[in-house]
Amino acid sequence: MAEALPKAGRYFCHSCTAEITPRLPEYTCPRCDSGFIEELPETSRNSENNSSNNSRTDQNRPSFENLESAQFTLPSGYGQVTFGIFNEGLDFPIFGTSGPVEETRDGESRREHQSRQRYGARQPRARLSTRRAAGRNEGVPTLEGIIQQLVNGIIAPTAMSNLGVGPWGVLHSNPMDYAWGANGLDTIITQLLNQFENTGPPPADNEKIQALPTIQITEEHVGSGLECPVCKEDYTVGECVRQLPCNHLFHNDCIIPWLEQHDTCPVCRKSLSGQNTATNPPGLSEMTFSSSSTSSSSSTSPTDENNSANNS
């Protein structure tokens, strides 16, 4: 009578770093034909039955090397999608009702993890499993659908409120505040610049603008190297310019549009009424220019100019 073959037990292949059922009677690994295997202790029959249905799919799962595990804390009532290596995972929310999280990892996974901890073997592959909250509502959008909507920039501020998790349950703020698409950053910068456009001093009074003296540029002005602070063009002899109470000179077309929006000098930020504490620029306060017969205001002091502007 032929001798019966020995019963195959549970073995761990150090070449494949996986739990195997050896090929008998050679006691070799059916995956790599290596004999570098070691018998593992027996476990309960229930664990063997629970792992039989899922053991075939483990070989078809993708392999990811050297993945660093991460854990994100999420509000209660969320399901979780776990991506990681065995007992360590990366969790993402799936919208659902509150309840205890149901563990779906099979018994073989726990045994393989214990074997790798025991023998110091490297992790051969990562697993992607889904842990759903108990009693998940049907028809609730999935994580993939929500991310796709956010990336496409088509989700509206009122859309997330219909998901039953409160507004902006995933993002930290309004999705419209994020930069979506190729031109998203440019749009945000433009919005920020528009917010600062109307800030600052109020427009100057039209009466004060019209009361600004007009003087004629002389050779003394040209010889001193004066230029319009706005357009940076040199003044020419005989050119008519407007003089502010701070003695700064500007082209009429350069200073009038500015004063219609801001009651300040573009150079020293002094208002037409002299309300701020800005001092006159050095040199101009002491300089006096001989003007033509059409205007004598250039030879007056800044105090006289302020008085004439207030009286007008």
From Swiss-Prot:
User: Residue ranges under compositional bias (Low complexity)?
Assistant: 43-57, 290-301
Q: Give a GO cellular-component term.
A: nucleus
Keywords of this protein's UniProt record, alphabetized? Cytoplasm, Metal-binding, Nucleus, Transferase, Ubl conjugation pathway, Zinc, Zinc-finger
Q: Which positions bind Zn(2+)?
A: 13, 16, 29, 32
The record's subcellular locations are:
Cytoplasm; Nucleus
From what superkingdom does this record's organism come? Eukaryota
Q: Which SUPFAM superfamilies does the annotation name?
A: RING/U-box
Could you tell me which pathway this protein works in? Answer: Protein modification; protein ubiquitination
- The segments annotated as RING-type zinc fingers are 228-269
Any idea what job this protein has?
A: E3 ubiquitin-protein ligase that mediates ubiquitination oF target proteins. Depending on the associated E2 ligase, mediates 'Lys-27'-, 'Lys-29'-, 'Lys-48'- and/or 'Lys-63'-linked polyubiquitination of substrates. Part of a BAG6-dependent quality control process ensuring that proteins of the secretory pathway that are mislocalized to the cytosol are degraded by the proteasome. Probably acts by providing the ubiquitin ligase activity associated with the BAG6 complex and be responsible for ubiquitination of the hydrophobic mislocalized proteins and their targeting to the proteasome.
Q: What name has this protein been given in UniProt? A: E3 ubiquitin-protein ligase RNF126-A
Q: Which organism is it from?
A: Xenopus laevis (African clawed frog)
Gene name tied to this protein = rnf126-a
